[in-house]
Amino acid sequence: LNTVNEIQELCTRFNKQQVVYISMGFGNPYGDPYDLGIVEKFTDILVTLQVPIIALADTIGVAQPNQIESLFKSLIRKFPAVEFGAHLHSNPMTSLAKIEAAFNSGCQRFDGAI
């Protein structure tokens, strides 16, 4: 987090916006504890550091639409000044449902690859 803070100070000085990704924002494949509270805790820390854009990453593609909806609704309500983004890994069968869940929950920033 010290590095995030240093980068944020540079961004502020040079009129840039830092984007920080919360990897494994929807689950942890290594058996470590995971829940909404952990994501909220790190989001709160990033907000304290004045990070303006936070992207939630489904690094391993395990997020379900209801989980995506719940997380974005909760975070957007608690941190209205933050621009939240989604970095979702998926397959053609589940991608639309995941994107719609994030969008319908207030997320308006999406990463994509072609």
Predicted regions and their residues:
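Glycine-rich phosphate-binding active-site loops on the catalytic face of alpha/beta enzymes
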Residues: 58, 107-114
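Alpha/beta enzyme core
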Residues: 1-18, 24-86, 93-105
